[in-house]
Amino acid sequence: MAGTDREKALDAALAQIERQFGKGAVMRLGERPNEPIEVIPTGSTALDVALGVGGLPRGRVVEVYGPESSGKTTLTLHAVANAQKAGGQVAFVDAEHALDPEYAKKLGVDIDNLILSQPDNGEQALEIVDMLVRSGALDLIVIDSVAALVPRAEIEGEMGDSHVGLQARLMSQALRKITSALNQSKTTAIFINQLREKIGVMFGSPETTTGGRALKFYASVRLDIRRIETLKDGTDAVGNRTRVKVVKNKVAPPFKQAEFDILYGQGISREGGLIDMGVENGFVRKAGAWYTYEGDQLGQGKENARNFLKDNPDLANEIEKKIKEKLGVGVRPEEPTAEPGADAAVTSAAAATDDTAKTVSAPAAKTTKSKAAAAKS
């Protein structure tokens, strides 16, 4: 009898909450629709796989941090380009006042439709972010960078004044306000951050990020990006080998790593990453300096194989699909008119896999191979 009374009381409370706050304000977890995680591809197949869901999750906070010139902005601009190619609206809050539109254009960003803000101080920047997110019209918003979100009091004060904790409090308040709106509008917020060193640390890493601890807690994904090697063509440096570690991930298992090439003036080499992952997963065969795919030679040396895939985007897409299907992450939907190196639309991992099964047929694969052979000859 007591149990029945408790159930009636709970049902009455739930009904009252729904009347007061609206339908869906409270529900049993099993009644909530289990929607697949929608993502924005990063431009690197290896990183999409390391993230576990095929890209950066929609409606979440993402932090990208690392040393100077490690590729933070480049990685973010690739995500911007991919969101735009899917028909999404993107805003870029350039607090550093350092965005190069020509470089962004080379990476595939539609600069004519990119919403840009270059705020005067941190409060103004985060107020703009809050208003844009609450509009519900954005798919992605980028803040570059957290370190440049200088509080108004610091800008208006004297050079030697101490402003302890101002930026941390500002970030904490802003994240409290925008996190819920991000989830409701399915907008991804990417915060680019810089590294600092703690003084007097004897054990462990002295490195830390700016802006206090709030961003570490609110971020669903945190990416640590580092330059590990300089790529050279003879004696000339042509790019960097980059490693990204997923140090926090709320949507898949964390602590996975991805490596890819960033070429100067071109950005992330998608084709180079496909060759590396193709060899690793057995789809591309390497014999000496030659790379082959299903009996067809891609080229002698990685650079020639990379150029061949760039000239044959259908073949590159086919290799990418096979890699992602094998590893069980989101697959790029087929785009017949896609340009070389063009990246995927924003898709969910599960839906994309189903779409691929429907769109890829044996005749299409044969046509691709015949094109590859013709291009070789």
Curated annotation (Swiss-Prot):
Keywords: ATP-binding, Cytoplasm, DNA damage, DNA recombination, DNA repair, DNA-binding, Nucleotide-binding, SOS response. It is found in: Cytoplasm. Residues 329-377 are annotated as: Disordered. GO terms for molecular function: ATP binding; ATP hydrolysis activity; ATP-dependent DNA damage sensor activity; damaged DNA binding; single-stranded DNA binding. GO terms for cellular component: cytosol. GO terms for biological process: DNA recombination; DNA repair; SOS response. ATP binds at G66, P67, E68, S69, S70, G71, K72, T73. Its main location: cytoplasm. Residues 342-377 have a biased composition (Low complexity). Can catalyze the hydrolysis of ATP in the presence of single-stranded DNA, the ATP-dependent uptake of single-stranded DNA by duplex DNA, and the ATP-dependent hybridization of homologous single-stranded DNAs. It interacts with LexA causing its activation and leading to its autocatalytic cleavage. PANTHER family: MITOCHONDRIAL DNA REPAIR PROTEIN RECA HOMOLOG-RELATED (PTHR45900:SF1), RECA (PTHR45900). Belongs to the RecA family. This is Protein RecA. The gene is recA.
